[in-house]
């Protein structure tokens, strides 16, 4: 059986499209829990009226009494999900009709801890702005992959038992975890297989108010200091995964993967802090350890404050 959980905050503009896409799934969820985090627009009214209009007896709307933030609201939702398989949903997205059926099938066939699919990117008008190339095949992903390329929460489905143990062990409070998809996505391989279904299953909306992604994150609009702060957080995050992994007695392969990820991130931090080209040379020898080549280029851009140059090149040649 399936639970779908979704956090909302001032999502009135797009929430009805997402509710429709969940309600009309070919494999209907057995439980939908929506937790609103003190919205000041019409989000709550729209959801309440929607549930009443469609007589959705298995849907529940909860309102936080105080603003908990995105992370704590999703942690709360994970604890409230009742069924064996749990899907996370974002308020602005649209699911394709076979999303729940496709991910449940892979989860059951592979006995995985977590499965995830791929997403179109759409703009505020619902127009597709990016369509990733996909194979349609299922691929197992290891810890090394997920430390660098964890899926976004809206793409995922988990076994409830995995979420329950993470919550009961209070891994939610470990340093570096501030997004539910980072927490659950990085820890899932410590509990079993993680499988990517390389198939487009939803449409993720990009707009100015997004929590997960905005135009600035794609355009070198941050600073060297913000990059340093981010890498320090990543190091804390990897240290937390390492400590949890040691508790769970994982394989030597996973230990080596964690060590490589920590070594690379520490080297990146040294480079940004010192601006010493010597460290850049060291990073070039480890470039395959980066998530993408763009991350290496971004380190160079932020270290030497080349943001303006990078933006002009992006504008001229495209992404």
Language model features by range: what are they?
Residues 139-218:
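Conserved nucleotide-sugar donor-binding catalytic segment
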Residues 172, 177-178, 203-319:
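C-terminal subregions of glycosyltransferases and related glycan-biosynthesis enzymes
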Residues 64-81:
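Glycine-rich, basic loop-to-helix element that forms the pyrophosphate-binding segment
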Residues 86:
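Short aromatic/hydrophobic "clamp" motif used to bind/position activated sugar donors
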Residues 16, 41-50, 72, 98:
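Acidic helix N-cap motif at the loop->helix transition within catalytic regions
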Residues 11-25, 30:
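Short, well-formed alpha-helical segments that are part of the catalytic scaffolds
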Residues 100-129:
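Conserved donor NDP-sugar-binding/catalytic core segment of glycosyltransferases
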Residues 36-45, 66:
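A conserved acidic beta->alpha catalytic loop
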């Amino acid at each position: 059986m399936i639970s779908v959980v979704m956090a909302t905050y001032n999502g009135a503009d797009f929430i009805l499209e997402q509710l429709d896409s969940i309600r009309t799934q070919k494999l209907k969820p057995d439980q939908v829990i929506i937790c609103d985090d003190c919205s000041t627009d019409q989000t709550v009214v729209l959801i309440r009226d929607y549930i009443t209009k469609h007589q959705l007896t298995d849907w529940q709307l909860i309102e936080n009494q105080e603003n908990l933030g995105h992370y704590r609201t999703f942690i709360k939702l994970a604890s409230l999900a009742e069924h064996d398989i749990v899907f996370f949903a974002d308020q602005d997205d649209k699911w394709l009709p076979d999303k729940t059926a496709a991910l449940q099938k892979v989860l059951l066939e592979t006995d995985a801890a977590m499965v995830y699919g791929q997403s179109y990117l759409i703009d505020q008008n619902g127009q597709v702005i990016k369509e990733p190339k996909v194979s349609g095949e299922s691929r197992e992903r290891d810890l090394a992959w997920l430390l660098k390329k964890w899926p976004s929460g809206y793409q995922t489905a988990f076994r409830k038992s995995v979420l329950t143990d993470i919550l009961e062990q209070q891994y939610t409070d470990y340093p570096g975890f501030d997004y539910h998809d980072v927490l659950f996505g990085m820890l899932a391989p410590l509990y079993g297989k993680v499988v990517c279904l390389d198939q487009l299953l939803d449409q993720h909306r990009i707009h100015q108010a997004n929590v997960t992604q905005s135009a600035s994150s794609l355009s070198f609009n941050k600073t060297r200091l913000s990059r340093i702060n981010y890498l320090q957080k990543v190091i804390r995050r990897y240290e937390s995964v390492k400590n949890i992994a040691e508790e769970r007695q994982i394989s030597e392969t996973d230990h080596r993967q964690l060590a490589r990820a920590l070594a690379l991130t520490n080297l990146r931090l040294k480079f940004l802090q010192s601006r010493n080209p010597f460290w850049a040379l060291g990073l070039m020898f480890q470039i395959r350890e980066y998530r993408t080549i763009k991350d290496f280029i971004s380190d160079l851009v932020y270290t030497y404050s080349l943001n303006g140059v990078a933006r002009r090149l992006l504008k001229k040649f495209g992404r």
